[in-house]
Amino acid sequence: MSFFISDAVAATGAPAQGSPMSLILMLVVFGLIFYFMILRPQQKRTKEHKKLMDSIAKGDEVLTNGGLVGRVTKVAENGYIAIALNDTTEVVIKRDFVAAVLPKGTMKAL
């Protein structure tokens, strides 16, 4: 009985191998999908954020990543800005931590 099993296993042979070109093509397709779905949008967001950071000027109303809303009072060349939260409180933060530049008059509406 066991000799029939060994004959059946030997008759199936080795599984067919795919061509290496199909593997390379699949890797290229996955690389392109990764680039267009992840890297390209991230580069676009980074470029827009850098443009936003360069456009910050004195008097702009900004929203920080921490949720603070204030008016820019000073813009330093070393990457820091001073934000007045109210008449008495001023905070110095890195320019990179600005999440958005708000329309004029937003602070008065709050």
UniProtKB/Swiss-Prot annotation:
**Where does it live in the cell?**
Cell inner membrane
Cite a GO CC annotation. Answer: cell envelope Sec protein transport complex
In this entry, which stretches build a coiled coil? Answer: none
Which Pfam family, giving just one, matches this sequence? YajC
Tell me the membrane topology, using the record's own terms.
Answer: Single-pass membrane protein
Major location category of this protein: membrane
Recorded hits in PANTHER family, A to Z, give: SEC TRANSLOCON ACCESSORY COMPLEX SUBUNIT YAJC
Give the family from UniProt.
Belongs to the YajC family.
Q: What does this protein do?
A: The SecYEG-SecDF-YajC-YidC holo-translocon (HTL) protein secretase/insertase is a supercomplex required for protein secretion, insertion of proteins into membranes, and assembly of membrane protein complexes. The SecYEG complex is essential for assembly of a number of proteins and complexes, assembly is facilitated in the presence of the SecDF-YajC-YidC subcomplex.
Assembly and interactions?
Answer: Part of the SecDF-YidC-YajC translocase complex; YajC is also present in a homooligomeric complex in excess of the other components. The SecDF-YidC-YajC translocase forms a supercomplex with SecYEG, called the holo-translocon (HTL). The stoichiometry of the super complex may be SecYEG:YidC:SecDF 4:3:1, YajC is in the reconstituted complex (with SecDF) but as no antibody is available it could not be quantified.
What is the recorded name of this protein? Sec translocon accessory complex subunit YajC
Species assigned in the record: Escherichia coli (strain K12)
